Amino acid sequence: LWSLKKISLLNDIDKCLAKRNTFQGFNKTIQNKVNQKIIEYLKPNDLVIDATIGNGHDSAFILPLIPKGHLYGFDIQEEAITNTKRILKETNYTLYNISHENMLETLKLENKISLIIFNLGYLPGSNKEIKTNYKSTIKAIKDGIKLLNNKGIILITIYPGHKEGLEESIKINDFLKNMNHNIYRNTDNPKAPYLITIKKF
């Protein structure tokens, strides 16, 4: 049943990705690509980190795919923790009301994590002045690489459409320039969100 569910989800995502991309639909298309990667990589007993839980949508998508695993979520806003707990149906998760830059020392799970997801920017529907910043994000990426198992992956959605997001985008790309990573875009608009994937081999 688990495998059939994955196949069904992938088919739905493929249909969405095959549609003509417009800037208005860009965020949704990027999210579909993120979801595609999540489905492709996860196994039932995997350990996962949601480094920016926000309103919990990524965590809610991931948890049914890891019924024998565990998800660890991080966010500096208590509102995000509350919102996420409200929508999660599963119980195999632990949420921390602290910055993702503290995940290495908090979890002590080096070489154990299968997937880490970052959805940068601000909490949708909340105070837009509270945003992720490149310093803590880069530290979290560095620590995340240590936490990944030998086939682990990091997914980072970046939003360069606002000042702080553009700075974060530039700094992260500069940090990654000598590392193995891939960038997924579906528009030439430099302000549009895009996805970075980092694989550990």
Residue spans of the language-model regions?
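Mobile active-site "lid"/loop adjacent to the S-adenosyl-L-methionine
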Residues: G121-A140
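Class I S-adenosyl-L-methionine
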Residues: H162-F201
